[in-house]
A protein has these predicted regions:
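Surface-exposed beta-strand edges and their flanking turn/coil or helix-capping segments
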Residues: 8-11, 60-62, 109-116
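Aromatic/acidic polysaccharide-binding cleft in carbohydrate-active enzymes
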Residues: 44-72
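General secondary-structure edge motif
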Residues: 27, 61-62, 150
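C-terminal non-catalytic alpha-helical accessory regions
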Residues: 51-56, 71-217
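Active-site core of glycosidic bond-cleaving carbohydrate-active enzymes
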Residues: 1-55, 171-175
């Protein structure tokens, strides 16, 4: 699944998410897949799916399920995936969490307060997951995305604040002089690196990336 430079890019994705996730990323998108599949379903008979990795595992499963019966609701297809690959205990919450991840990529990042709610949903599942589930890449990948989105969201808010204060410092040049204003501006901009935010989320992302890498074998 490619979120840009593709036939069906992610619609309305904000620039910081697109730049940090990259073209090929963990991108479960059942609502979009349902729309695209059914839009063209009458023009062919079935399909062949392929993958450049496991990042789009759910989307492949979903698409083939729609080939089997295009009238199946998107939520039902994801629930079938969750019940089979994750287990019945978490299936309903996993399904809701997948759709929440898809919504994380819609619209201006700074205004998407649902990202924190999405993380809490996945953290609740993480707390209840058994050892086997916590070694299951099909669970770990969307869990990782929830942490990743929350990290980028907090970092983006922080860096927007840094940028705003840097502009304010530049506006002081007529009063303070250009050299002093520039020095102050550089110092403020440096806060993005000197005072990074949400490091606990970043560390959890790194742990989950490592786990996915090893559990995929």
């Amino acid at each position: 699944t490619h979120i840009y430079s593709s036939q069906y890019p992610a619609r309305s994705i904000d620039l910081p998410m697109a730049m940090t996730l990259g073209r090929i990323c963990i991108n479960p998108s059942p609502a979009a897949q349902k729309h695209i599949h059914n839009l063209y379903a009458g023009l062919g008979v079935g399909s062949l799916t392929y993958s450049e990795g496991t990042n789009d595992d759910l989307n492949k499963f979903f698409w083939l399920g729609q080939d089997w019966d295009a009238s199946t609701e998107a939520e039902a297809s994801v629930f079938d995936y969750a019940r089979y690959f994750i287990g019945p205990d978490l299936a309903a919450d996993f399904t809701a969490g997948i759709f929440a991840l898809e919504r994380n990529l819609i619209g201006p990042l700074a205004e998407n307060e649902e990202i924190d709610t999405t993380l809490k949903m996945w953290q609740s599942m993480e707390e209840r997951a058994d050892d086997a589930t916590m070694r299951n890449p099909r669970f770990l990948m969307p869990l990782l995305r929830a942490y990743y989105d929350a990290y980028i969201y907090r970092r983006w808010l922080h860096e927007l604040d840094v940028e705003s204060r840097a502009y304010d410092a530049l506006k002081e040049a007529p009063k303070r002089g250009s050299s002093r204003a520039l020095s102050r501006t550089r110092a403020i901009l440096g806060e993005a690196r000197r005072k990074p935010v949400a490091q606990e989320l970043k560390r959890r992302c790194e742990e989950l990336y490592e786990a996915v890498y090893h559990d995929e074998g």
